[in-house]
């Protein structure tokens, strides 16, 4: 059955029913951070800097140093105070560390963070419950972090098929007790077909003693209900690294794109401007003859975007920039009003004056505030005549 919702035809089946029918179910997520990455590359290109974001160095020490110091404003997934502290303790040295960090920093897996960090700092002290676990868990310092590791363990130690391993993963993640008990039995003792042939060999028939097998299954059971899909975490970690790389290697371009992406959020804009100051990037005030709609880069400095100013609309700014590019810079407040009279309103001009956007023109702010209404009225009258 289907239904129409806002001109879109959609199924009335639940996601579980869709999967049971063998149909493909996909989740599409929109990320503002992808726009920030794209805009950073475009801003850099304006200055003749070519950034091939698909071929950056994922082993740049400066990037990992920045992350380890907690300077992660604008870095995807790493902005929260808790995540900053985690990165400082973790001191990631490669993309795998970031991937694991993203997978661990959630309710449930957080309990495993101390053990993960301890093992990372002293890998020589890691003890595996069975030698076969080393190849599976060595990358995550002896800890089960991903769903894929659970599947790999039951396949390597107990001979499960890929399909059966995925069934175990689902049973663990959804806490299905009956299925879990069956999976435990099969994992430890194996499973035979009706004709007596071996379906899954099991740990004991694979030379692993019962006590060790029980303990390993308990570990999987404890973590699997929280375990993250590695492909999901890896996709996130690459976006994380790309944003961190751009911030580290092209800070002005990145921060300009970042601030432009949150121009409707005053608190975010202020926070990111403070981070610019922290990193030695000067943010120039708005200027009627220099500013664009968005934040832009001038040398190693950032110029304030006009659409960030309260009561200054996007369409008005587009018209302003177009007029400036066509007929040159504005020479005075009256020149500005005369050329923009069909687009402006008094509130917008007042806010531009108060923001300092006219400071480069003759006269003080107080003088401009005292006369701008009279200038606008006179230009309106002149236009009617």
Model-derived segments and spans:
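Noncatalytic, beta-rich nucleic-acid-contacting surfaces in large DNA/RNA-processing enzymes
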Residues: 1-385
């Amino acid at each position: 059955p289907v239904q129409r919702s806002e001109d879109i035809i959609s199924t009335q089946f639940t996601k579980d029913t869709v999967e049971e029918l063998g149909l493909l179910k996909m989740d599409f997520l929109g990320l503002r951070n992808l726009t920030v990455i794209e805009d950073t590359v475009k801003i850099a290109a304006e200055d003749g800097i070519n950034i091939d974001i698909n071929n950056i160095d994922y082993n740049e020490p400066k990037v990992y140093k920045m992350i380890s110091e907690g300077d992660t404003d604008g870095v995807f997934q790493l902005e929260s105070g808790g995540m900053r502290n985690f990165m400082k303790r973790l001191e990631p040295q490669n993309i795998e560390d970031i991937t694991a960090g993203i997978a661990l920093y959630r309710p449930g897996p957080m309990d495993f963070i101390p053990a993960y960090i301890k093992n990372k700092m002293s890998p020589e002290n890691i003890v595996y419950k069975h030698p076969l676990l080393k190849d599976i868990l060595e990358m995550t310092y002896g800890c089960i972090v991903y769903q894929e590791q659970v599947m790999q363990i039951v396949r390597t130690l107990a001979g499960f098929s890929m399909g059966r391993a995925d069934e175990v993963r689902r049973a663990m993640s959804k806490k299905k007790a009956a299925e879990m008990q069956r999976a435990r039995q099969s994992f430890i003792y194996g499973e035979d077909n009706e004709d007596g042939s071996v379906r899954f060999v099991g740990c004991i028939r694979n030379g692993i003693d019962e006590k060790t097998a029980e303990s390993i299954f308990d570990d999987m059971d404890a973590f699997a209900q929280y375990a993250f899909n590695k492909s999901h975490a890896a996709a996130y970690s690459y976006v994380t690294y790309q944003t961190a790389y751009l911030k580290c290697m092209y800070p002005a371009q990145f921060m300009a794109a970042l601030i432009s992406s949150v121009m409707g959020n005053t608190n975010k804009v202020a926070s990111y401007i403070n981070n610019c100051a922290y990193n030695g990037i000067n943010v120039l005030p708005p200027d009627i003859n220099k500013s664009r709609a968005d934040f832009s880069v001038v040398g190693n400095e950032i110029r304030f975007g006009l659409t960030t100013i309260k009561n200054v609309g996007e369409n008005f700014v587009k018209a302003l920039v177009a007029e400036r590019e066509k007929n040159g810079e504005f020479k005075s407040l009256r020149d500005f009003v005369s050329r923009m009279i069909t687009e402006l309103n008094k509130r917008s001009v007042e806010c531009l004056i108060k923001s300092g956007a006219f400071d480069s023109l003759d006269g003080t702010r107080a003088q401009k505030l005292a006369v701008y209404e009279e200038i606008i009225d006179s230009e309106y009258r002149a236009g009617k005549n």
